[in-house]
Amino acid sequence: MKDLLKFLKQQSKTEEFNGIKIGLASPDLIRSWSFGEVKKPETINYRTFKPEREGLFCARIFGPVKDYECLCGKYKRLKHRGVICEKCGVEVTQTKVRRERMGHIELASPVAHIWFLKSLPSRIGLMLDMTLRDIERVLYFESFVVIEPGMTSLERGQMLTEENYLDALEEYGDEFEAKMGAEAVLELLRAIDLEKEIEQMREELPSINSETRRKKVTKRLKLMEAFHTSGNKPEWMILKVLPVLPPDLRPLVPLDGGRFATSDLNDLYRRVINRNNRLKRLLDLAAPDIIVRNEKRMLQESVDALLDNGRRGRAITGSNKRPLKSLADMIKGKQGRFRQNLLGKRVDYSGRSVITVGPTLRLHQCGLPKKMALELFKPFIYGKLEGRGLATTIKAAKKMVEREVAEVWDVLDEVIREHPVMLNRAPTLHRLGIQAFEPVLIEGKAIQLHPLVCAAYNADFDGDQMAVHVPLTLEAQLEARALMMSTNNILSPANGEPVITPSQDVVLGLYYTSRERINGRGEGMYFMSVAEVEKAYATGAAELHARVKVRITETVIGDNGERTEQRRIVDTTVGRALLSQILPAGLSFDLVNQNMGKKQISKLLNTCYRQLGLKDTVIFADQLMYTGFRYATISGASVGIDDMVIPAEKYTLVADAEAEVLEIQEQFQSGLVTAGERYNKVIDIWASANEKVSKAMMENLSTETVINRDGVEEKQASFNSIYMMADSGARGSAAQIRQLAGMRGLMAKPDGSIIETPIVANFREGLNVLQYFISTHGARKGLADTALKTANSGYLTRRLVDVAQDLVVIEDDCGTHEGLTMKPLIEGGDVVEPLRERVLGRVVAVDVMYPGTEDVLAPRNTLLDEAWCDKLEEHSIDEVIVRSVITCDTDFGVCAACYGRDLARGHLINHGEAIGVVAAQSIGEPGTQLTMRTFHIGGAASRASAENNVQVKNSGSLKLHNAKYVTNTDGKLVIVSRSSELAIIDELGREKERYKVPYGTVLEKLEEASVEAGDIIANWDPHTHPIITEVAGSIKFVDMIDGVTMTRQTDELTGLSSIVILDVGQRGSAGKEMRPMIRLVGADGSDLMIPGTEVPAQYFLPGSAIVNLDDNAQIAVGDALARIPQESSKTRDITGGLPRVADLFEARKPKEPAILAEISGTISFGKETKGKRRLVITPADGGEHYEEMIPKWRNLNVFEGEKVERGEVIADGPEAAHDILRLRGIHNVANYIVNEVQDVYRLQGVKINDKHIEVIIRQMLRKCVITSAGDSEFLEGEQVEVSRVKIANRELVEQGKVPATFERELLGITKASLATESFISAASFQETTRVLTEAAVGGKSDNLRGLKENVIVGRLIPAGTGYAYHKTRNDARAKKDEPVVVNKITASEAEQNLADLLNLAGSQD
């Protein structure tokens, strides 16, 4: 019966588990793990190489050294298994138990665990409410602590130095007890009554007023509750028993020459054992106190070093001055257990080799060298050889393969057929870095790669290497074929556009084919079909570029899928007609009837995919490639030095610029301009000269004039090779051609400033030594930048993946009605991103109506595809509310409707799709293309003259957004609100452009008026800020006393006098409290009110305001009472590129953030303190007013008496994301981060869908702070996952209790990763020690929800195909958890049940 049970136990070894709990180990638990106590520091006998008894490698404790053989050799072989040898005490079993059997050391004196002592905040310190400094002094025997005060005046936990202790002893005798060392701390911890303490603290919390004290108590309360609920005991933070790691995990390996290589842990354990034994001896001898104390301190230090070397004091070093690697070092960092062995493993059945081009391959194939294939597919070959009876045993098969017999190759062909392999190129930045192909056997040793997948791999053939992996199991092969095949990865997951677009040679070939040339041989011929064109081309009757007329046949596919043929005659060229042969049926000929540049080809493939689906697109892409290569070869496009045509005008342009520079130089020498102005002017002159030269050059290159058949001059695009390469998008750009044939232009110094003498030469003319030297700066900086960039970009990707890794689609629809409002992105009047691109592939959250009616155009929950977007554009909708992951209500994960279309597949996203990782990869992958630098606004850019008007680009009608205005005497509108915007609407009601206009803008047109393109419709003075009156009347000066609060200045030229208000700092003591203002009064002298309010019309004047009016003057509505000079804001460095993206995702506060209004209300200024102004906002409803101190030098946008809305900008600057979230809500912060990140990527021409950024933002917003706890378990001010609060609140509401209220919090990605619910994921990211300490104290359990945790414990991930597996498991578990009725059974029944169980277990295996 016992054997049966043992067998059962072995059966259920791979028990399914659903979580991992971490906690503190009690001394008894450690003893229960142990197989014996390690008493001696010896390791192995250096003569016999046998482990020493009771030593660190003892066979009796840890198990036999050889399989099924005891140490003395009495029992050998399998038949004795389980016997314990009576001579040497070793159990006869497998030697692998030495990897799992632990030992222990009984410590002679307790020792504090350094993690709970030193990991901040110190858990032991928090528990005892003592400072870390004090506890350390007790532990390391520097002072005493009172444990039992007895009847004395001492307090428990009071520190006593040696002298104080002796004094107390004299005074009180043995009334009290005080100790030092870990024993003292142990007793203090043991004496804590958790329940009582918790109750006490919960009671005193509400009455605490001081913020710091409250925080401290809350922290302590949380710790105590964690201990209480998890069942950990505080005294377990002090070790009495030390576990010993199994010996095979800290091996001792003999090297040749009689030396040993050993794990550092053995040294560390040896020190502990030595000191422990010495301490035991000293205690037995009753040695003097001071010696024992010293030994105890040394023991404490050696245990510290074993657990975490270097955490306290100097690290213990080995013989070679290198710090020893402790247990903590084993798990943390890039080389630690987590990142080296659990998250990244080496893989068998893999090989790597150099890659080369396979231009004849199909898209789903790769060329695999025979040698590699033979090695990789060995087991399959052996199996086949045996199955065919060609070899009798595996050994024979092995021999055959080694000899490379002819049959082996036949078998290999068969094995490889339909067996995909995976190709990977490092660095794998996104999921397209590993794709599956069908291998084609080739001679040679290099892997052949299909040219079209190079873009996805970012591969080129200059020596890149790639790795091959073989999917072994049937499931793996199936997944490789169905999901990872290169033909299934045509669209990029980052933006949904084709990623297999042709580039370089292919583009050049197709472009060359589709160009037209005037007077080409065969021009003007008529052809009845494309076949006839082909004959004419083949016989040489017509050349490739001749303009001809051809009758073509097109297949049109209707909405219901029926195909109809249409014939028409088109004007085209021979080349384009030939291209139409490979065009799949159902695509219009117009798609190829144009110059086929890279953009056009990409669009062609995209159209093909959307209209005809995957299969046709793949075949078409291959055909395009073959055609492109063929015609690129035929074209013979090559670059010769004469192709770089230098424009004749260059020399005159350069001479003109030099003359201008001389003129400026003279002005500078005669003192008319400053050095800075001169420098800026010179740079401007050269920059514009360069522009002119390059313009002349491009005009010269791009067209040539020919005489056509009718004898008339006609311009045609040039066939210059360099121009064709740039124009088609195959290689090079206008900027590069400019350096070849124009002039190199201005160069930068290493510090980023521009050198004012440009390089006038170009590469064709050649550079002289100085010019070459100047050029080297930029080149070197570029290389240094690239190296830094790669590391930074990789780290950003890692943080992004870590924060988003557990986000998976888990349901169809969460049912939320919330969403984000999408409008076209308009900047400075231009539409940067039309609405179509922003909503394509998203789901509608709120019905979209036909404009101006109540009819629904697109109902809620519609997935907007291309056809729907066409419809929206047709009805000129310019605002759609779409579902977003940020507003998704699913608890753990998101729903498909909130995510929308799977960009790489083009349909609604599937369950189990790991959208978090995809988002992180999409944002991180282009990271290396972003720049690293911060831009200094200087030179040409900074003097972009301040804008002072709006000139419209499109005709339409004028519309104002959140603007208040008054009409002045000229009948023009004057804006009197901030953050107003002015938009131009076309006749369909679509917004074409939008501009921000400041306070005091004068509009030339009324609202709704029609404007023509090019009209100037708004003017303002950029250098002063007016104060506009909203009522007419006569003015009264209040508190404006000459010489006290103001001075009069007279302009010498005009003789006009004006009043200047003095700044508070410049006034005498009399004027400090005065508030100069202008009051408006009616004819009878009574106060006038601002229209629509009870507020008297009075305008406060800030310091340095200029008033051009006299007291009692009459004014009209819309007049300026005063002007405040604006200092141009200091030139700030604009952080760009990668650092900017990192700052946004880390939610870092900018240096001088914009100050936003915390509440809505009226502005006033209170009493000033030195260097600061006191800003007061009084709400209209008479609630609590809000005060804020603002430094004097900040440029405020608001004036006394103005009304502001909550979240409005008070002082300019970069806005902080946290402020936006707090004051304007979640939608605004999402929009802000998305737009800011997109700006950086757009600048580099990288397209990323907004969805991906939103996914990361959702993860940044997943925590919240409890504002009031209601009836919940949460503490006020506690940081909790939003989903947990929502679940708890739902339960509370169901029970009719008060739910908790919370405020969302924005965390940077690093913080958010570390704050995740899963401690395994957080520990494997960063700060391993801190995370594990916290988790252990709280007794946290990890439910293994995310991908990372599951990879670490070695399971399928709960995403993709693993999602189904986990789902079925969870469903089964839910079923199993239903309560079961238990009946008592007899012993015989139990035996019968056991037998059944065994049969069942056997059948399941």
Curated annotation (Swiss-Prot):
Any one Gene Ontology BP term: DNA-templated transcription
Binding locations of Zn(2+) 1: 70, 72, 85, 88
Annotated keywords: DNA-directed RNA polymerase, Magnesium, Metal-binding, Nucleotidyltransferase, Transcription, Transferase, Zinc
Superkingdom of source: Bacteria
Record carries keyword Nucleotidyltransferase: yes
Catalytic activity as recorded in UniProt: RNA(n) + a ribonucleoside 5'-triphosphate = RNA(n+1) + diphosphate
Gene Ontology MF term list: DNA binding; DNA-directed RNA polymerase activity; magnesium ion binding; zinc ion binding
SMART domains (alphabetical): RPOLA_N (SM00663)
Enzyme Commission number(s): 2.7.7.6
GO cellular component terms listed in the entry, alphabetical order: DNA-directed RNA polymerase complex
Cofactor dependence: Mg(2+); Zn(2+)
Co-factor binding comment: Binds 1 Mg(2+) ion per subunit.
Residue sites binding Zn(2+) 2 per the record: 814, 888, 895, 898
InterPro entries the UniProt entry points to: DNA-dir_RpoC_beta_prime (IPR045867), DNA-dir_RpoC_beta_prime_bact (IPR012754), RNA_pol_asu (IPR000722), RNA_pol_N (IPR006592), RNA_pol_Rpb1_1 (IPR007080), RNA_pol_Rpb1_3 (IPR007066), RNA_pol_Rpb1_3_sf (IPR042102), RNA_pol_Rpb1_4 (IPR007083)
Pfam family, one: RNA_pol_Rpb1_3
Binding site for Mg(2+): 460, 462, 464
Family stated for the protein in its record: Belongs to the RNA polymerase beta' chain family.
Free-text function comment from the UniProt entry: DNA-dependent RNA polymerase catalyzes the transcription of DNA into RNA using the four ribonucleoside triphosphates as substrates.
Subunit structure: The RNAP catalytic core consists of 2 alpha, 1 beta, 1 beta' and 1 omega subunit. When a sigma factor is associated with the core the holoenzyme is formed, which can initiate transcription.
Protein name: DNA-directed RNA polymerase subunit beta'
Gene name of this polypeptide: rpoC
